[in-house]
Amino acid sequence: MLFNKSFKIIFCILFFYSTPVFSFDTNSEYAFLLDYKTDQILFEKNSNKKIFPASMSKLMTLYVLFDYLDKGVVNMTDEFIISENAWRKGGAISDSSTMFAEVSSYVSIENLIRGIVIQSGNDACIAVAEGISGSEDLFATEMNFFTQKLGMKDSNFKNSTGLHHNEHYTSAKDLVILAKAIIKDFPQYYHFFSEESFTWNGIFQPNRNNLLKENIGVDGLKTGKTDQSGFSMIVSSFVNQTRLIAIVGGLPSKEKRTSEMRKLINYGQKAFKRSLVFKANQVIDTVDVWGGEESFASLAISEDINLLLDIRGRRFLNARYLYNSPVTAPIKKGDTLGKIIILNDDQIIIESNLISNKDIDGGNFIEKAVDAMGYLFN
């Protein structure tokens, strides 16, 4: 039988801060702020709205490339050619973001990554697409394969660059999913995003993510801009052992983009405090055991649950836990017996397993017979 129980989590600790606490809003057309560790949504505005991602699309180009590197299909020292197509669409002649690679030159994958991350080079993106898949069209099918794999439900990619196409779109939430996947799946390559400049073909270019130079913990990821998308930006920050991922977009200028992102990151860092809600192995209830040496098993929290809590005064969350009863012995320590769900205003914040905190061996024939009779009559 499935049991479903609820209770309130009461916080008795009061948090005091010298800085004033504020509500938050943004002039950005869309925005999304996520706690990397728990997937808590700290702020959202039009997060599922269809948007044109511009150069933020290049995060998916990089994800595909990182996957090929991780699997050993290609290596950092491998070189891809800058075809005439890549040069005309994304090179110096194109009047678009470029790493200024020369036509028919060969560029190592390592330098192409820098050309994409730091210089937002369309020529570098097309060279990667052609080097991996033979053409941008075929590469786009690989990009869309990963949208499905990562759960990016509102995305469709038509090219590697983010140059405008009416059928090339995504959402703020999907791009945050992608950014988190890059950090989580390929930490060995994330350092590229924090490099502040790159020189290629004698031409120096600074990283377009100008928040890297500010003391707010930003260490990646990407900016974007087309006439149709406006100015956009997705970043990650790491301060006080807390990583946040944030996106803003649809803004009229680079300056507005930077200021709105700075406000959003500052809000995430100042308005929330990470608190221990449950300790690992904390027992919250018991469950009946059938056919065991003991009649009950403890339902214990499987891991420390730390959440970012709004310091503006909320003192409780709701928790719901589910389990089947009875459970059948033998039971091993660490076996999953149920799950706990923590909610804020009916929004699920986090789910975690409930486990047995000890071994329970199967009982003898008499103990099993007694249990069977008891459950038969109940």
Residue ranges of model-derived segments:
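Sec-dependent signal peptide recognition
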Residues: N4-C12
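Hydrophobic alpha-helical segments and their boundary regions
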Residues: F7-K8, S28, I93, E136, ...
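N-terminal signal peptide c-region/cleavage motif recognized by signal peptidases
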Residues: S18-P20
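Active-site-adjacent loops and short helices of periplasmic peptidoglycan-processing enzymes
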Residues: F22-V176, K180-K184
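Domain-terminus/edge residues, biased toward the C-terminal soluble/receptor-binding domains
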Residues: M152-N156, H164-Y169, K173-N378
